[in-house]
Regions:
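Formylglycine-dependent sulfatase
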Residues: 2-9, 20-257
């Protein structure tokens, strides 16, 4: 099971206040919700968790102004199934989406559907990876291709049922799409936007402007680079994602022959 740490900014909510023998009622305002997901993002790459490799000032601000969780877990470490768990609040064997080769049954109850019923305008933008089209969203623009992982450069999107290709880098494009939704949303309604970035998921393709940003930086080797799994169970040694088993010269190291 993958250990996930997340920083959440909790919006202020107005509550009913009760006095001595009298009750003063204040209008309860429905909070706007922005759910931000990055993909395979280790805490060592976030300075708000003490990571020193790079600085992440925007994430740090969210962590400082909200609540930072230091010990929480995803119920499924796979991309699509983990997303299905977030949407449904159910374990994978209950919601039926157990691996990335499956298709999510969007007919079941999800929290965006409940928010719609409560008067929210809902949107999902970025990586979806559930194969089926979104339900419970007034607007969606989700990555397609490469088995729904999407591409880093000039990616294709399914935008409200229409396939479109956007020129540029995927992180910039997803961010611009999210900002456009916020600018053009129905201001008379509260909103919930699920904002899902593809990065930094393998195969680690940066924006062209960042290709040389670490040319003069030497990163320390992690202690587990050549791990012998001493003192741990057999499952750790037999897991698939390791340098020896899955790291490739072309896909990962970008060494062209």
């Amino acid at each position: 099971m993958k250990n996930i740490s997340a920083a959440l900014l909790l919006p202020a909510v107005a509550f009913h206040l009760t006095g001595c023998g009298t009750q003063e009622k204040k209008e309860v305002k429905q909070p706007n919700i922005i759910f931000i997901m990055t993909d395979d993002h280790t805490t060592q790459a976030m300075s708000c968790y003490g990571g020193s490799l790079i600085q992440t000032p925007n994430m740090d601000r969210i962590a400082n102004e909200g609540i930072r969780f230091d010990n929480c877990y995803a119920v499924n470490a796979l991309s699509g199934p983990s997303r299905a768990c977030v949407l449904t609040g159910k374990f994978s064997h209950v919601n039926g989406f157990t691996d990335n080769a499956a298709t999510f049954n969007g007919d079941q109850q999800t929290f965006p559907k409940l928010l719609q019923q409560a008067g929210y305008q809902t949107a999902v933008i970025g990586k979806w990876h559930l194969i089926s089209e979104p339900q419970g969203f007034d607007h969606w623009s989700i990555l397609t291709g490469q088995e729904e992982q999407g591409d880093y450069y000039s990616p294709e999107f399914n935008e409200n049922g229409k396939r479109i290709t956007e020129e540029g880098y995927v992180t910039d494009i997803i961010t611009d799409k999210a900002i456009r939704f916020l600018d053009n949303r129905d201001k008379s309604k509260p909103f919930c936007m699920m904002f899902h970035q593809k990065a930094p998921h393998r195969n680690w393709m940066p924006a062209p402007r960042h290709l040389g940003i670490f040319n003069n930086t030497v990163f320390p080797e992690p202690a587990t680079l050549f791990d012998d799994y001493k003192g741990r169970g057999r499952a750790a040694a037999e897991q698939d994602m390791s340098l020896a088993k899955t790291f490739t010269e072309d896909w990962d190291l970008k060494l062209m022959t």
